From Swiss-Prot:
Keyword flag Repeat: no
Keyword field: Acetylation, ATP-binding, Endoplasmic reticulum, Fatty acid metabolism, Glycoprotein, Ligase, Lipid metabolism, Magnesium, Membrane, Microsome, Mitochondrion, Mitochondrion outer membrane, Nitration, Nucleotide-binding, Peroxisome, Phosphoprotein, Signal-anchor, Transmembrane, Transmembrane helix
Activity regulation field: Inhibited at high temperature and by arachidonate.
Gene Ontology biological process: adiponectin-activated signaling pathway; fatty acid biosynthetic process; fatty acid metabolic process; fatty acid transport; linoleic acid metabolic process; lipid biosynthetic process; long-chain fatty acid import into cell; long-chain fatty acid metabolic process
Induction: By high fat and high carbohydrate diets.
Name under which the protein is recorded: Long-chain-fatty-acid--CoA ligase 1
Catalyzed reaction equations: a long-chain fatty acid + ATP + CoA = a long-chain fatty acyl-CoA + AMP + diphosphate; (5Z,8Z,11Z,14Z)-eicosatetraenoate + ATP + CoA = (5Z,8Z,11Z,14Z)-eicosatetraenoyl-CoA + AMP + diphosphate; 3,7,11,15-tetramethylhexadecanoate + ATP + CoA = phytanoyl-CoA + AMP + diphosphate; hexadecanoate + ATP + CoA = hexadecanoyl-CoA + AMP + diphosphate
Primary role: Catalyzes the conversion of long-chain fatty acids to their active form acyl-CoAs for both synthesis of cellular lipids, and degradation via beta-oxidation. Preferentially uses palmitoleate, oleate and linoleate. Preferentially activates arachidonate than epoxyeicosatrienoic acids (EETs) or hydroxyeicosatrienoic acids (HETEs).
EC category: ligase
Tissue distribution: Liver, heart, epididymal adipose and to a lesser extent brain, small intestine and lung.
Classification of source organism: Eukaryota, Metazoa, Chordata, Craniata, Vertebrata
Glycosylated residue positions: 136
Length: 699
């Protein structure tokens, strides 16, 4: 049968008939068809496309075959074998920087700025040159090029930190960071524990603090302080009197330049960093982190996000989170091994927004406290009902796209509503990651929509080199911390006294992989508490597996928790101090990971309160006094005074209290038979008072 006969058979017009029909159409109609076709083609070519997820997002982790303990691994992996290195030639921090030199083609590496000035950059090879000079100078001063040689850094984030760090790694030395918030006693402890004989300090004020320890014979091991900024000769003379050499960083570089030593790079198993964690009780613990630990964790991040993101020399990171913590160290390591640029903030968090506008970063790691401030500021500026409605409406439209896996910053809502928010961060951010403490699902979901970039949430701790779980590309839901990273396994173990059972998908989170640290420096007892005989790290966090294979953190094994800014709180220690208040019989200190401060429920002493109040000019029955707001204020002031005298840090002090007239007891279910507080029951019992305190207190 001929083709034209087939057309007739199916009553379909031949091409010649279609042409004749088209000729009869009016010009306006033809133009309309043409415009519609053009718009359809344009939409198809430019329509927003969902990011391709690396695995089935309904099952992001799978159980490891052959295990009976419910061990799970990332579904991104093809089999049960964990990822060790993403790049075969990058196995140490030194290797990573050398790769950065190559892939960047000696491009800009580290940038800094002075007030009201643009960023000034030094190249990768310039950093490598300075690093070799610093390392060579240390060897000239008698320090050994080996992983038993510890070098202290006491500084804010700045280019010199990376240069000094690379100088240490070039010669297999180990970096020991120090930071202000540890306190003087903790710094003294670390200097002695790590036997630091040389410390690099950014400012003369920190050098003076270190000298005080030597002068008071508290840190006799310290012999050299290298200062980055300019300083007076008085400081040199002061150092000479107690046997400490004060030298400028530039002078040290010059010494190394004329005494160059061939690099002696480290092995993957060698120590890279001793990261001291503040903890809650006792002295800081020095987590021993190897080069393999760091590069393995970096590799896990790269593998988990490779379907949607690979860093490049065009990327720019804003460095403001403390380099003394592993989170920022890992982020910067990922950037450097891809030849990206790192721009440092001016050192003043109040100027961060100005730094962002000038630097225009593409990578922006954050902590929940900053996200909360951004969220509050955005909604604070939406000061009319119309503005608030528009903001809510636009965010809901963007959230709908997120649920479809679409991430973009060029929608109508971005142009009308969110452009100003995005511009405040420089306008070029393409990836954000948050960690260190939990973030509110409301805040995270809104900012994911408003900022229009890939926004990941991670979970981990220093002992697993910052991260062990990470949300995956395409899963922009909140309320979980993602799936196990491709570099480690996760399992949950029973916590019987808290009624958490691994068989029900709840229990203490345990981690195993090449990112798990070697132990605590010179502290076998606490190492044994953290690492079991099979190499599992016990985090102390209680987790729950969700149906999609992601992990949700729901509790702490011990009564220790973090506030929104990441500080650890030991409530029982604080309660024992507050119980010294004459008027207080019982106290329950409470904090939440999404709140920046503590509150407390206080039960006054029924026999003491009336006379205590009378001395302060208050009269009434016990119940009346408990309801008196002025009494509430007086009790709080007395507690805070006791806390200050006992050395509580500002974040350990409660900011508000609710006075309750009835004692916690076994009968009302708030105490155990051994008269210990049942904290979950107390939390639930006083939920309304807790919520009211958090809603009314502004700090």
């Amino acid at each position: 049968m001929e083709v034209h006969e087939l057309f007739r058979y199916f009553r379909m017009p031949e091409l010649i008939d279609i042409r004749q029909y088209v000729r009869t159409l009016p010009t306006n109609t033809l133009m309309g068809f043409g415009a519609f076709a053009a718009l359809t083609t344009f939409w198809y070519a430019t329509r927003p496309k969902a990011l391709k997820p690396p695995c089935d997002l309904s099952m992001q982790s799978v159980e490891v075959t052959g295990t009976t303990e419910g061990v799970r691994r990332s579904a991104v992996l093809e089999d049960d074998k964990l990822l060790l290195y993403y790049y075969d030639d990058v196995r140490t921090m030194y290797d990573g920087f050398q790769r950065g030199i190559q892939v960047s083609n000696d491009g800009p590496c580290l940038g800094s700025r002075k007030p009201n000035q643009p960023y000034e950059w030094i190249s990768y090879k310039q950093v490598a040159e300075m690093a070799e000079c610093i390392g060579s100078a240390l060897i000239q001063k008698g320090f050994k090029p080996c992983s038993e040689q510890f070098i202290g850094i006491f500084s804010q984030n700045r280019p010199e930190w990376v240069t000094i760090e690379q100088g240490c790694f070039t010669y297999s030395m180990v970096v020991v960071p120090l930071y202000d918030t540890l306190g003087t006693d903790a710094i003294t402890y670390i200097v002695n524990k790590a036997e630091l004989s040389v410390i690099f300090a950014d400012k003369p004020e920190k050098a003076k603090l270190l000298l005080e320890g030597v002068e008071n014979k508290l840190t006799p091991c310290l012999k050299i302080i290298v200062i980055m900024d300019s300083y007076d000769n008085d400081l040199v003379e002061r150092g000479q009197k107690c046997g400490v050499e004060i030298i400028g960083l530039k002078a040290l570089e010059d010494l190394g330049r004329v005494n160059r030593t061939k690099p002696k790079p480290p092995e993957p198993e060698d120590l890279a960093i001793i990261c001291f964690t503040s903890g809650t009780t006792g002295n800081p613990k020095g987590a021993m982190v190897t080069h393999q630990n760091i590069m393995n964790d970096c590799s896990g991040f790269i593998k988990a996000t490779e379907s949607a993101f690979i860093a490049s020399p065009e990327d720019v990171l804003i460095s403001f989170l403390p380099l003394a913590h592993m989170f920022e160290t890992v982020v910067e390591c990922v950037m450097l091994c891809h030849g990206a640029k790192i721009g440092f903030f001016q050192g003043d968090i109040r100027l961060l927004m100005d730094d962002l506008k000038v630097l225009q970063p593409t990578i922006f790691p954050v902590v929940p406290r900053l996200l909360n401030r951004m969220f509050d500021r955005i909604f604070g500026q939406a000061n009319t009902s119309v503005k608030r409605w528009l903001l809510d409406f636009a965010s809901k439209r963007k959230e709908a796209e997120l649920r479809s896996g679409i991430v973009r910053n060029n929608s109508l809502w971005d142009k009308l509503i969110f452009h100003k928010i995005q511009s405040s961060l420089g306008g070029k951010v393409r990836l954000m990651i948050t960690g260190a403490a939990p973030v509110s699902a409301t805040v995270l979901t809104f900012l994911r929509a408003a900022l229009g970039c890939q926004f990941y949430e991670g979970y981990g701790q220093t002992e697993c080199t910052a991260g062990c779980c990470l949300s995956l590309p395409g899963d922009w839901t909140a309320g979980h911390v993602g799936a196990p990273m491709p570099c480690n396994y996760i399992k949950l173990v029973d916590v019987e006294d808290m009624n958490y059972q691994a068989a029900k998908g709840e229990g203490e989170v345990c981690v195993k992989g090449a990112n798990v640290f070697k132990g605590y420096l010179k502290d076998p007892a606490r190492t044994a508490e953290a690492l079991d005989k099979d190499g599992w790290l016990h985090t102390g966090d209680i987790g729950k597996w969700l149906p999609n294979g992601t992990l949700k953190i729901i509790d702490r094994k011990k009564h220790i928790f973090k506030l929104a800014q990441g500080e650890y709180i030991a409530p029982e220690k604080i309660e024992n101090i507050y119980l010294r208040s004459e008027a207080v019989a019982q106290v329950f200190v409470h904090g939440e990971s999404l709140q920046a401060f503590l509150i407390a429920i206080v039960v006054p002493d029924v026999e003491i309160l009336p006379s205590w109040a009378q001395k302060r000019g208050f009269q009434g029955s016990f119940e009346e006094l408990c309801r008196n707001k002025d009494i509430n204020k007086a009790i709080l002031e007395d507690m805070v005074k006791l806390g200050k005298n006992a050395g509580l840090k500002p974040f350990e002090q409660v900011k508000g209290i609710a006075v309750h007239p009835e004692l916690f007891s076994i009968d009302n279910g708030l105490l155990t038979p051994t008269l210990k507080a049942k904290r979950p029951e107390l939390r639930n019992y006083f939920r309304s008072q807790i919520d009211e305190l958090y809603s009314t207190i502004k700090i």
